[in-house]
Amino acid sequence: MAAELEGSKCLSGLLSGLAQDTFYGHPGITEELLRSQLYPEVSLEEFRPFLAKMKGILKSIASADMDFNQLEAFLTALTKKQGGITSEQAAVISKFWKSHKTKIRESLMNQSCWDRGLRSLSWRVDGKSQSRHSAQIHTPVAIMELEIGKSGQESEFLCLEFDEVKVNQVLKKLSEVEESISTLMQPA
């Protein structure tokens, strides 16, 4: 059994399948599919604990968002642990994490956002060309465009126009927010 679970290609495929199911939301990846495609000679009773172990390891690595030094320390500890993993399995897991870390992290970030977020912000200063009152023509106005949306969905755009008074009010509020954050961040 142990030799059958050693193959690096099979383990790499298993980790990819687990990532598809666990992090990317592809529900078609089942325990039976992984076993039949990657480890057909291993019984389901032998495969289940191995699958659970690899899934747990992958979830631990992803939830801690391990950098490569942390990963190496974690995998080294697992190789020394009774019933842990082999050094060959550790090498495959390390290689897998190095090539999939960014994509898994992005997927977890997208899953953790419940509401829409700010995707982009652009602004410019223009001269007002139309107004109800002729005295307001050619006065400077700040135009701000916000792109708001959730990953995987179409964005909405919000366009705001500020005169000089409103810009100063916004800047004052931002300064107050900055002061509040600085106060909260002061060591006690």
From Swiss-Prot:
Q: Which domain of life is it from?
A: Eukaryota
Q: Which Gene Ontology cellular component annotation is one that this UniProt entry carries?
A: nucleus
Give every COMM domain span: 117-185
Q: What is its main location?
A: nucleus
Which molecular-function annotations from GO does this UniProt entry contain?
copper ion binding
What's one GO BP annotation on this UniProt entry?
regulation of proteasomal ubiquitin-dependent protein catabolic process
Q: Does the keyword Transport apply?
A: yes
Self-association and partners: Component of the commander complex consisting of the CCC subcomplex and the retriever subcomplex. Component of the CCC (COMMD/CCDC22/CCDC93) subcomplex consisting of COMMD1, COMMD2, COMMD3, COMMD4, COMMD5, COMMD6, COMMD7, COMMD8, COMMD9, COMMD10, CCDC22 and CCDC93; within the complex forms a heterodimer with COMMD6. Interacts with VPS35L; the interaction associates the CCC complex with the retriever complex. Identified in a complex with an E3 ubiquitin ligase complex composed of TCEB1/elongin C, CUL2, SOCS1 and RBX1; in the complex interacts directly with SOCS1 and CUL2.
UniProt record similarity statement: Belongs to the COMM domain-containing protein 1 family.
Query: PANTHER family given for it?
Result: COMM DOMAIN-CONTAINING PROTEIN 1
Indicate what this protein is called per its UniProt record.
COMM domain-containing protein 1
Q: What is the lineage of its organism?
A: Eukaryota, Metazoa, Chordata, Craniata, Vertebrata
